Structures are given as structure tokens and as C-alpha cells.
Amino acid sequence: PNTGGMGAYPPTPLVTEDMLRSIEAKVLVPTVHQLKRMRRPFKGVLYAGLMITKQGVKVLEYNARFGDPECQPLMMRLQSDLLDLLEATADERLEELPDLLWDPRPAVCVVMASEGYPGSYTTGHAIRGLAEAAAVAEAKVFHAGTALRDGQVITTGGRVLGVTALGSSIANAKLQAYTAVKCIRWEGAWCRTDISDKAQH
């Protein structure tokens, strides 16, 4: 079934430097140039949803926002000031900024979802264990389909939380993320158990 994304992990060994250069040259730069030719210059975050196939890179979609859940592990690794970056983008002065600083460690994000997602699901379930999950070393819990009702965090959507962790390796980041996932409970909570496995084989 088609979901909004159930996990993410950067950097991935599945994408080489050559592949990144090719994506920039064949997808991103032509897109920006075409927008300018159409007199629709773009300032902001342009997220390209791509699929790597045997025939090369295929564009699935563009979004004028960060990807979800791709943003969560990227923000865990970003050491530069995000506000400075966004303001420089809006003011068209990106070239004035120094190179971005990144934590060299990989990050893994695991999306916790409501039972039934991506089909029909129920909401309003109390979420427990958030403090315990946040206490896991190098882990953070990003909220998506949640709300605060009478002092209790409850589910309000299909994709509920993005549990994300840094690690010394992809395997270690996965271990930390799933350690935090195991702390969190609500009726019908589920997640994939194989996020980042393709990068470890």
C-alpha cells in the first residue's frame, strides 16, 4: 500500500557521489532553470521525490516543503543554523553563507503509525512513554499526528510520531531509534521493523 513514508536514513551508502552529481545535473538544475524560463522562479525548499531504477533516476513528485519523514533525520544531522539558512534562501543570499556543517554520524527515523494506516484508522488514543523515549541517548521524538488534550498527548492521525536517533553507524542509529520506539505505547501502535536494513547489506 502507498504510505506517506515510514522511515528515512541519511546518509545512505545506496546513493553514491556520482549518483548525487547526476541527480543535480539531470534533475535539479534543469528544474530550477525551467521554472525561471516559465517566469516562476522558486525560493524555498524544493523536495524532489525520486526513485532509483535500473534505467536511472525517475522523478515521482516535487513538493515545496521538506520531505516527511526525510526532514527529521536531516535536522538531527544539521549543525548549521537552520534559521540562517532559510532567511538566506528567502533573501537570495545563499552564496554568502559558509558551507553547511553536518554531524558525520548517520541518523535513522522510524515512523510510528496508527493501526490500519494507510487505510482507515481510529484516533484519540493516549500515548504513553514519550519521556522514556526522549531519554534514550541521541534520540528525539518528532510529533506529526498528535494533539494535547487535558494534559495528555493523543493520536490524531495515521502517521503519529517520527522517532529518530543518531548513531556511530547506520546499525547503531537503527538500534537507538528502535530502543526509543519500544518505550512508546498506544492502542494499535505499529511501525516497520526494517528501516535502514537495505543500507546494511
Can you name each region flagged by the protein language model?
Residues 1-71:
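Internal nucleotide-binding/catalytic subdomain
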Residues 12-24, 68-88, 125-141, 183-185:
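Gly/Ser/Thr-rich active-site loops/lids in small-molecule metabolic enzymes
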Residues 16, 20, 24, 28, ...:
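Generic structural signal for well-ordered, non-membrane alpha-helical segments
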Residues 31, 52, 56, 60, ...:
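Short alpha-helical interface elements
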Residues 43-48, 55-62, 73, 82, ...:
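Structural beta-strand/beta-sheet cores of well-ordered domains, especially the beta-sheet scaffolds
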Residues 63-75, 116-118, 147-149:
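Glycine-rich phosphate/pyrophosphate-binding beta-alpha loops
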Residues 88-201:
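Peripheral (often C-terminal) accessory segments that flank ATP-dependent C-N-forming ligase machineries
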